[in-house]
């Protein structure tokens, strides 16, 4: 039975990421313990995606959340849960890789291989029917009735493969679908999860304007859209979302981060430690302070309770 309710809080300043690690039982056990420790000690936001670790991360989140709630340690409203969809995914516990999942599960439900655009091994789609399947599966994995936030995952892949106007039209259709999910109480808010735009803001193939996306979201919601968050890589080695004037709002050239803020979209920094690379020359304190100074929230991936203890000192 799915747990009812949703968070009564905004995303915590630091959220726990769940993308790292292999699909083994050992890693899953570490994640479950890490999630429970983090939530009980102030990092109450958990960032995930249906494709992380072949769905195992979401399933681990679901087990940890249920154990916390059923034991009375926390209530549903104390936890902020995030997921993402858009990339082709598999189900490792059912021994289905993404190709097999497409053929055996998605295609019988009307999803076609031609719905996806591909880049560097990642297949991405904006087809609302795919998101319907993915969202329902995420809610099942997480044992939840409502997600606090659901992201469109790496839409740059699709935008790079189609005409700009067609891309905005497809995003508008997807926004309309999302607004319907808010009405159905399946999500509270939605957002955009970027990969390449943050890393390579001057590369035209990854470019689209957030002002136009916000306009399209407002259009399908009578000006009351639930498009609220944008997540992108931001760290000392990738400062571009706050240094490169890559967006425009009311004719003014702005950085990605400043454009989001001007449009009323909350900014979330992913990979604040640059996958550990930045720790070679900078302290954890330097890196977290840099990311927190530049964005309203950050996501730090960890399955290690000792690492989480270090993070807690920055809350």
Across the structure, where does each feature detected by a protein language model lie?
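Beta/alpha (TIM)-barrel catalytic core signal, keyed to glycine-rich beta->alpha loops juxtaposed to Asp/Glu
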Residues: 18, 25-30, 34-35, 50-54, ...
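An active-site-proximal structural segment forming one wall of the substrate-binding cleft
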Residues: 123-146
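Aromatic-lined substrate-binding rim segments of carbohydrate-active enzymes
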Residues: 31-32, 54-82, 168-177
């Amino acid at each position: 039975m799915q747990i009812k309710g949703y968070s009564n809080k905004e995303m915590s300043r630091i959220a726990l990421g769940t993308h790292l690690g292999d699909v083994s039982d050992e890693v899953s056990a570490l994640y479950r313990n890490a999630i429970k420790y983090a939530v009980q000690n102030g990092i109450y936001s958990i960032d995930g995606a249906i494709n992380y670790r072949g769905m195992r991360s979401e399933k681990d989140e679901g087990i940890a959340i249920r154990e916390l709630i059923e034991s009375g340690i926390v209530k549903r409203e104390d936890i902020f849960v995030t997921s993402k969809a858009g990339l082709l995914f598999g189900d490792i516990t059912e021994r289905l890789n993404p190709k097999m999942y497409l053929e055996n599960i998605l295609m019988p439900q009307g999803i076609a291989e031609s719905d996806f655009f591909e880049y560097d091994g990642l297949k991405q789609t904006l087809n609302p029917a795919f998101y319907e399947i993915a969202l329902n599966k995420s809610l099942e994995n997480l044992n939840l009735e409502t997600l606090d936030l659901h992201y469109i995952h790496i839409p740059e892949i699709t935008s790079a493969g189609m005409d700009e106007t067609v891309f905005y039209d497809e995003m508008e259709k997807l926004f309309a679908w999302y607004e319907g999910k808010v009405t159905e109480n399946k999500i509270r808010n939605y957002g955009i999860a970027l990969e390449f735009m943050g890393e390579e803001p001057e590369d035209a193939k990854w470019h689209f304007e957030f002002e136009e996306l916000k306009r399209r979201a407002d259009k399908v919601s009578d000006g009351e859209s639930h498009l609220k968050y944008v997540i992108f890589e931001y760290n000392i080695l990738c400062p571009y979302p706050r240094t490169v004037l890559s967006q425009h709002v009311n004719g003014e050239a702005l950085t990605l981060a400043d454009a989001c803020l001007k449009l009323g979209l909350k900014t979330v920094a992913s990979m604040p430690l640059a996958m550990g690379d930045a720790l070679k020359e900078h302290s954890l304190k330097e890196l977290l302070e840099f990311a927190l100074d530049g964005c309203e929230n950050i996501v730090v991936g960890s399955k290690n309770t000792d690492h989480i203890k270090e993070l807690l000192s920055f809350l």
